Curated annotation (Swiss-Prot):
Family: Belongs to the bacterial histone-like protein family.
Record's GO cellular component terms: cytosol
Molecular function GO terms recorded: DNA binding; structural constituent of chromatin
Subunit structure: Heterodimer of an alpha and a beta chain.
Name of the featured protein: Integration host factor subunit alpha
SMART domains membership: BHL (SM00411)
Function: This protein is one of the two subunits of integration host factor, a specific DNA-binding protein that functions in genetic recombination as well as in transcriptional and translational control.
Lineage: Bacteria, Pseudomonadati, Pseudomonadota, Alphaproteobacteria, Hyphomicrobiales
Pfam families assigned: Bac_DNA_binding
InterPro entries linked to this entry: Hist_DNA-bd (IPR000119), Histone-like_DNA-bd_CS (IPR020816), IHF-like_DNA-bd_dom_sf (IPR010992), IHF_alpha (IPR005684)
Organism of provenance: Brucella anthropi (strain ATCC 49188 / DSM 6882 / CCUG 24695 / JCM 21032 / LMG 3331 / NBRC 15819 / NCTC 12168 / Alc 37) (Ochrobactrum anthropi)
Length: 107
């Protein structure tokens, strides 16, 4: 089920092949895009990439957790977390690819 991990270099290479920019320009473009996304998220903005996903920062309140070894209650401090919500388009593509692979493996 697992596959290759796609890196920044892989994205830059794909831009190089598909867009025709130089490798240096492609890598710089990927970095600029990722920097913009990161800056927006850090500033608490929601980043919505249609047909892909939404990245959002949420505040979580303090709550009581439990140490699994001792059972002792431990306070979990309030914090900010980033959430990733895949779009319905992406979810559908994932499902279709899974179904194709399942069909091939049954033959």
């Amino acid at each position: 089920m697992g596959g290759k991990t796609v890196t920044r270099a892989d994205l830059a290479e794909a831009v190089y092949r598909k867009v025709g920019l130089s490798r240096t320009e492609s890598a710089a473009l990927v970095e600029m895009i990722l920097d913009e996304v990161c800056d927006a998220i850090v500033n608490g903005e929601t980043v919505k990439l249609s047909s892909f996903a939404t990245f959002q920062v949420r505040d979580k309140n303090e709550r009581i957790g439990r140490n699994p070894k001792t059972g002792e209650e431990v306070p979990i401090l309030p914090r900010r977390v980033m959430t990733f919500k895949a779009s319905n388009v992406l979810k559908q593509r994932i499902l279709q690819e899974h179904q194709k692979r399942e069909t091939k493996s049954q033959k």
